[in-house]
Amino acid sequence: MSTSKHIDVICLVGACLTLLLTMAFVCGETLGLQAADVEMGYESRLFDTSQVHTIDILMEDWDGFLETCQDKEYAQCSLVIDGETYGSAAIRAKGNNSLSSVSAYGNDRYSFKVEFDHYDSSKTYYGLDKLNLNNLIQDNTMMKDYLVYRMMGDFGVAAPLCSYVYLTVNGEDWGLYLAVEGVEEAFLRRNYGSSYGELYKPDSMNGGGGGRASNDDVKLQYLDDDPD
């Protein structure tokens, strides 16, 4: 009889806990529970899509940096983002297929990866630790990445924030780029409330670790004015 009473108590406690958890999931905001999403600060600044932002990269030996871009080694620089200066940041060329494509096209308009916390872990851009600057050199529309990231966000997918930026280097015109939130610690904290967890990144589109992949099946190409 004693054992039966204990089982009844355990079942009752379990049922109550289940009910409380269900209420927390269904009525979390009403009960005062906060969602995992965290406001970081950079969302409403660099990733405000109502304007084209400005970024000026300041580096003494820019020509020397370009000569070693294929090595993807970080170099120290300063960034002036919408008039605000951030010193002691780190920058390198980024990409696999796109990196080799820049040389193949005969120019030096690389995509870049910026780490605000590379030399000092306490430094960020309003909470943002990593930033990608995509050259969009393989997209004649210069819109595919932007549209896909925005659609993913509208569908509730944890997608990187992005916005267009007018890039200059030591005051020299470097063209229109797409600034993309790095999928790193700040991205995890903004979307999941914590910067710790499992995070995976493929080496290349074809999964082969650097081989060239064809984009023929996904490219946007003008065919005709007649939609039929």
Where are these regions (language model features)?
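Phosphate/dinucleotide-binding and metal-coordinating scaffold of catalytic cores
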Residues: M1-D228
